[in-house]
A protein has these predicted regions:
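C-terminal helical cap/extension that packs against the catalytic core
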Residues: 260, 378-435
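Short acidic/histidine-rich motifs immediately flanking catalytic phosphotransfer sites
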Residues: 69-74, 163, 435-437
Length: 456
């Protein structure tokens, strides 16, 4: 990983963003725009984020074109930008420096006196959103970079005037190694992105490097064996949370307060600090909210302020987000879950909510993940009453090296059906879903588009 360049924006006035309509770009754009830089950008399609950016006075061009970069001092691009992009090519011809989004995120994070960087295979977006909500409701005006839309701030992040920034920190391609957290959070470490990391040891080594970048304090899940092993002998202050004795902060007396929603007490060194009642479903959110409670109180919030923000948190976009109803009255929801651990947590919560049936509409994401975890996918998807699937979304991969298809997964799930496109899925739901059912689309690709077509 390259060393941080503190002079990255020295003498720079106009910053051009390629892929400016992406949710990961938007908070960075907001922060740098508020800092006084002239921002321009481009993307391939119009969208809500671009509408917001234009309302801020930002010049956004559709589509990408070489002339868009003329006069820029620096170009920022997302990892989704394909080789041969005309704007990057023209920038290189003109000698305009080009940096990937994660590099700029590392720079932006350092603009704030204190940073809370949230890492982990699962739960990053929810936990980042919770912490942001607590700090915002406590009047601390944090900056934030979140992977999902947080209703309280009407977006994926914000440029705060306070001393804190809360950053969702992704391990894929080692992008979180550009950060320098004041406080880092390790929620869990699970087998994912092995197309990049190849082995669990490499994955854990990456998280270890991230933890070693921490300047002040590491907040870690003391119940997660991989996390505990990764942090052994780290030489930093480590504060643990969990549900077992031995953790610094312990969730006790966990109970279901209504179907799929949990409450619990927070204890610290024998003292009962608070009682939390979650407004997001699923027992897995006990861990996410414990991390948020610890981070928020150590950032200067009172226990009461932490509880107020956590209790009021109803989720972020694409995290068990209820979208509406079908013509027959079935409830339609959407969730980003795309790993067996996440699917198991989401479907288990859904089954507790009192619906007649849970119909899981799944878009497997990447050939490598599907092949590696095929049996685990088959096991957890059978939690649902009915499984409907699309073809695998390859994203950055081609199937030549993997030879895996949705039909292979469907063969392991009795009664499941699959369709090559969304038309077949939507038609199937229209004909088979009934009032009292929950239809939940699952995946980190574009399966949400099918969900939106189902609702009236």
């Amino acid at each position: 990983m390259n060393e941080f360049d503190a002079r990255l924006l020295e003498g720079k006035k106009r910053l051009h963003f390629v892929g400016i309509g992406g949710s990961g770009m938007f908070p960075i754009v907001q922060i740098l725009h508020a800092a006084g830089y002239t921002i321009t950008g481009s993307d391939v399609n119009e969208g809500d984020i671009i509408n917001y950016e234009r309302a801020m006075g930002i010049d956004v061009k559709i589509p990408h074109a070489a002339e868009n970069v003329e006069g820029a001092d620096l170009l920022v691009y997302t990892a989704a930008i394909l080789p041969g992009n005309p704007e990057i090519g023209r920038a290189q011809e003109l000698g305009i420096p080009c940096v990937e989004r994660s590099v700029m995120l590392g720079y932006v994070q350092r603009l704030y006196a204190k940073s809370i960087c949230v890492s982990g295979t699962h739960g990053k977006t929810t936990t980042t959103g919770m912490i942001t909500q607590v700090l915002e409701m406590a009047g601390k005006d944090p900056a934030a970079v979140i992977g999902g839309k947080l209703p309280l701030i009407h977006g994926y992040g914000k440029a705060g005037k306070g001393e804190n920034i809360v950053v969702e920190s992704c391990e894929f391609s080692n992008t979180f190694l550009h950060l320098s957290p004041d406080t880092s959070i390790l929620l869990n470490i699970d087998a994912d992105h092995l197309d990049f990391f190849k082995t669990m040891e490499n994955l854990k080594a990456s998280f270890r490097k991230f933890a070693e970048l921490t300047q002040r304090r590491i907040i870690a899940n003391g119940d997660d064996a991989n996390t505990v092993e990764t942090l052994a002998g780290i030489g930093r202050e480590v504060v643990t949370f969990g549900q077992t004795e031995g953790c610094d902060y312990i969730a006790k007396n966990i109970r279901m307060v209504r179907p799929a929603f949990y409450g619990y007490e927070v204890w610290h060194r024998g003292e009962r600090l608070a009682e939390v009642t979650l407004s997001v479903p699923g027992k897995h959110n006990v861990y996410n909210s414990m991390a948020a409670f610890v981070a928020s109180t150590l950032a200067g919030c009172t226990a009461a302020e932490a509880v107020r923000g956590i209790d009021a948190f109803t989720g972020t976009g694409r995290r068990f987000e209820v979208l509406g109803h079908t013509a027959c009255g079935a409830t339609v929801a959407d969730d980003y879950a795309h790993h067996p651990t996440e699917l198991e947590a989401t479907l288990s919560a859904a089954k507790q909510m009192g619906f007649e049936r849970v119909i899981a509409v799944v878009q497997p994401f990447t050939y490598s993940r599907t092949k590696l975890l095929l049996k685990e996918f088959a096991r957890v998807l059978q939690i649902a009453d009915q499984v409907v699937m699309s073809e695998i979304m390859g994203s950055r991969e081609t199937n030549d090296a993997f030879n895996i298809y949705t039909a292979d997964l469907a063969a392991l799930i009795p009664g499941s059906v699959w369709f090559p496109g969304f038309d077949g899925i939507v038609d199937y739901i229209e004909k088979n879903a009934k009032k009292g059912d929950l239809v939940i689309t699952l995946g980190c690709g574009d399966i949400y588009k099918a969900a939106k077509r189902m609702i009236v």
